[in-house]
A protein has these predicted regions:
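Core alpha/beta structural scaffold of self-assembling particle/tube/pore-forming proteins
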Residues: 2-80, 92-458
Length: 458
């Protein structure tokens, strides 16, 4: 009809059950699109402050039987004051010993199906290529494991079993993270998906059974296993990484294969009696000054340690390292002096804090020596470093790369009946950390008084 038009409308159902004219968000929901923020949010912590601070000289590892070093560890005892025509001491000799450094190895791998790679190539279909993402981020994961190694003693121990786990529960209690004695935060180095082997600490042999970590519990004291553990597992067994759930030999675990870290390099023989083939008990210059039960922090005790290093080999402390919880105890030492100190920007206001509040990962100082917090260090430790004289080195046979000797980084997964349309990439490195003069450094264990907040590192 002329002058008349039809206007379409939509009937929508209201909460009372009746249909009404008009469109609401429910009616047009099918038209809506997902709105995505730009980029991928980073949900893990990729900073490695200990590797940033502890920067050893890189040494090209030549192979063969390892790098042999010689050390002068004893004097000729014959110098003697004598009278005219008197007898004097018999001939003595200088004392030298040899040690040998061999590198250790770390490997990692990733797996991608053909579809995972193909369907993420286009920026229209994926935020990032899955191949690029996996191959880039695994380098961050490797660096994180190296940070763990530098904070521990080279045994590759994540933690110790706390008590007999029994066979009635999949909740496994642990303590002494990183094989550093302590009852708190035993699971701090565990990750979901890991396979764990139990090592008898007395013999170094593997216990029967492998445990898979399905959850790392937030209280810091335990982990949830995929199944109950073997009856062979016992209190204070070392828990180390195993290659898979079928491992029966220590060869296929990380036990005694990690790069050596500060607890074994700066040591008196407690953690590592034989230092690169040198018996520390026979060579005091390779024994660090270690206080096993330091107790509460005190400036006098810290000065005493600095004096010991100076008296022994002329050492001069250039840096202190400690966990943030221990650093908070250090800050308390000067709390009374700061309480009424004026803020630097406003003389009318007081500032009871320090620069550590503004930058928790930054340095404060002790006698102009930087005090650096390192989150992966032992929870009750302090390290006194003479960075100028300690002669820190890292022997490097391979700094790290993907295996490509057969002409390709990506290799087919499986053959025959086990073949899958997927590809793997393997990464490896061969290194070892070394300190040439450990006696100019010191370590405290057993610091007390700190309040530990259990915060799993992402």
């Amino acid at each position: 009809m002329k002058g008349f038009s039809l206007i379409p409308f939509v009937l929508t159902q209201s909460p009372d059950g009746y249909l009404h004219v008009g469109a609401d968000s429910t009616a047009v929901f099918g038209l809506y699109k997902d709105v995505f923020e730009e980029g991928i949010a980073e949900g893990v912590n990729n900073s490695n402050p200990l590797q940033d601070i502890f920067k050893p000289t890189k040494v090209d590892y030549k192979g063969g039987k390892g790098h042999t070093f010689e050390a002068h560890v004893g004097r000729n005892p014959s110098p003697m004051f004598v009278s005219e025509d008197g007898a004097f001491a018999g001939a003595g000799a200088q004392r030298h010993i040899n040690g040998t450094v061999n590198v250790r190895k770390m490997m990692a791998r990733l797996r991608l199906t053909q579809e995972a790679m193909d369907d993420s190539v286009s920026s229209e279909a994926s935020w990032k290529s899955s191949k690029k993402d996996e191959m880039t981020r695994i380098i961050d994961d490797i660096a994180k494991r190296e940070e763990f190694a530098l904070s521990t003693d080279g045994k590759g121990v994540f933690c110790l079993l706390q008590g007999d786990p029994g066979t009635s529960s999949t909740t496994i209690e642990v303590d002494s993270p990183g094989n550093i004695a302590g009852s708190s935060f035993g699971n701090r180095f565990l990750q979901k998906g890991m396979f764990l082997a139990a090592i008898n600490p007395a013999s170094g042999t593997i216990r029967a059974g492998i445990s898979k970590v399905v959850d790392v519990n937030e209280d810091g004291t335990d982990y949830t296993a995929a199944a109950v553990t073997d009856t062979d597992w016992a209190d204070n067994d070392y828990l180390v990484q195993a290659a898979n759930g079928s491992v029966t030999d220590t060869l296929d675990t990380a036990y005694n294969k990690a790069y050596h870290g500060l607890p074994s390099l700066i040591d008196d023989g407690t953690n590592w009696a034989t230092y690169f083939e040198i018996q520390r008990s026979l060579a005091p210059s390779y024994k660090s000054y270690v206080v096993s039960s330091a107790g509460a922090l005190a400036t006098d005790a810290m000065q005493r340690t600095a004096d010991v290093l100076y008296q022994k080999l002329g050492g001069e402390v250039t840096r202190l390292l400690m966990h943030p919880s221990v650093r908070r105890e250090f800050l308390k030492l000067t709390e009374a002096d700061r309480r009424y100190a004026p803020a630097s920007s406003d003389r009318k206001q007081s500032d009871p804090g320090t620069v550590a509040f503004k930058k928790p990962g930054g340095d404060v100082s002790m006698g102009e020596v930087p005090v650096t917090p390192i989150r992966t260090l032992g929870l009750d430790q302090v390290y006194f470093l003479d960075e100028n004289r300690m002669s820190a080195k890292q022997y490097v046979a391979e700094p790290g790369r993907f295996v490509d000797e057969d002409g390709s980084i990506l290799v087919r997964d499986g053959v025959g009946d086990s073949a899958r349309h997927a590809f793997e990439a393997w990464w490896f490195a061969r290194k070892e950390n070394f300190i040439g003069n450990p006696a100019v450094c010191a370590r405290w264990d057993g610091v007390t008084g700190q309040t530990l907040v259990v915060v799993p590192e992402l």
